[in-house]
Amino acid sequence: IILGTVEVPGGFRFKPPYPKPSSIHPKPHFKVTPNAPLDGPHLGFVHGPEDLALDDQGNPVRIDKAFSWENPMSAHGLMHMVISNAYAGDPYKIDTLFMYMANMSWNSSMNTSGVMEMLTEKDNKGDYIIPRIIYSDAYSSEMVAYADLILPDTTYLERHDCISLLDRPISEADGAADAIRWPVIEPDRDVRGFQSVLVDLGARLDLPGFINEDGSPKYRDYEDYIVNHLRKPDIGPLAGFRGDGSAEGRGPVNPKQIEAYIENGGFYVSHVPEEAKYFKPWNNAYQDWAVELGLYDNPSPYIFNLYSEPMRKFQLAAEGVGERLPPEHLKDRLKKVMSPLPIWYSTEIDNEEKGEYPIHALTQRPMAMYHSWGSQNAWLRQIHGLNPLYVPTKIMRDYNLKTGDWVKLSSIHNSITVPVAEMSSLNENTVWTWNAIGKRKGAWALDPNAPEATKGFLLNHLIHELQPNKGDGHRWSNSDPVTGQAAWFDLKVKLEKTTAPRESQPSFEEIKSPVGVGPKSISWKVRV
C-alpha cells in the first residue's frame, strides 16, 4: 500500500467479487433457537469486542472458540480445535459431531496420534467421550473408521458442483468468472452427491429455505438448487446465462442454465470493462459494473487503512476501556498482538525452543492431495507414492546424511522416524515434507504394504494442537492469537541419524476397511 502497487498495472490486483469493504460483510452469528434456523451466517468479520461470539458470562459459544477473546478475528473458524475441545468438554460437551470430508483422524489434524485416542476414549460409564460421529466422504479415508454413520459421497466425476461468485470463484483480475462440474460417469455403487444429501436433509428437517409453502421439498437435488436457488432477487449461485440465456450477474432463473454452461466448456466469464480494470475500490466505472453484475447492492468504495480501528478496539479493551473486557489471563497478549499498526513478533514456540529444537519444519499438501484423493490415481502414485523428509545440503553434511538414510525427527511433543532426501534449493535451517501422501494401513482401499502406508509419513504427529503447558490451568491453543489460524508453520525440531526400521514410525494397527482393497483394473460407464 505504501509503495502504491495495489490495483495498478504490474501490481497486486483484486479478483471479482472483490474488492469489498469489510463493513459490508456479515458479522458472525451464533444465537441458536431449537427447531429454527441460525440467526444469520455463522462466519463473518468482527469490528470490535461487541461482535464476539460470547454468552452472557463471556464464555465462547462455538465449540472451536472462534470469535472469542482467545482469537477474536477468526473468520475461518478453528477446525483443528473441534475434536480436542469436544473431548475436553471445553467450552462444553457435545453429543454429535458431523463432518464432511475432513480427515481429522489423520492428515488434517495436529497431534494425530492423540486425536485418534480422543475419538476412541470412553468415560467411566463405558460411553465414548464424543458419543456420535456422522461423516461423509467419497473414499474410505482414515476418518471413516471412526464414524458411527457414513454418508457415502460421489467423486468429482459423478456429481454437480458450483464454483460460485457467492463463494470462491475462478475469477481473474480482468474478469468475474464462475464454473460448474457435471457428471460424466454413472456411479456404480450406492452413493449420492453430498450436496444433494444436504438439500434432502434440509427438506426433511423442514428448514424454511428448502421447502415450499405446502411443506414439499423445494429442490429435487443439488443440480436443481444450483439453477433455482435465489440468494437475492435475480441473483443465484451462477452468474452466467440467466433469464433467456443472455443475462449475466442478475436475471431470472434459466431452466437451461446448466446446459448452457456445459456447452460453454463448464464456465462463464464477464470481463471487466477497460475503463474499470484498475483502482477498483475508487473507480466509478468498476463500482457501477459491480452493482450491475450483482457483486454489490450499491457502490461501495473504501480506502485502505494502515491503522486498523477494529484491532485498536480490542487493544483498548485489553487496557480496560469499554463495557466488554477480556479475561485477566489474556489481557497482556491482546495488548501486544492487537496493535493497530503492522508489527512483527517471534512466536512463543520459537522463543522457547531455540536451543534444543533449532530447526524449522514445515508440511504442505500437494495439489493432487486435495482431500487426500491423489492416492486413487495410478499414475500420480508413481510420481508421489511416498514422501521423504526434504533436508537442506548443510544439514545433510552436518549430520553425515545421504538420500535414502533415515532420521529420528523430534519436537517438544513427539518423535517420528522417517527417510530423508537432500534438497539443495532449501533454507539451510528448514526441513519439510508433503502432507497427506502417507496413509494409514487399511484406508483408501490401498494394499496394506503400499509405499504410502510403509514409507509415507505425517509430520502432524510432531505438532500439538495446544501450546506447551504453562502451569496456569489454561488450554492455550496452538493458533494465531488474532485470527485463530492453526500454527502449522511454527514447528521447531531436532534430528538424529538412525538405522532404517522396516517402515516409517509411528506405525499404527491396520484399520478395518468397509470397502476392502481396490481392484487391479476398473471400468466405467461414461456419459456421452
Model-derived segments and their meaning:
Residues I2-Y146, T155, D161, N254-Y399:
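Extended redox/cofactor-interaction regions of prokaryotic respiratory oxidoreductases
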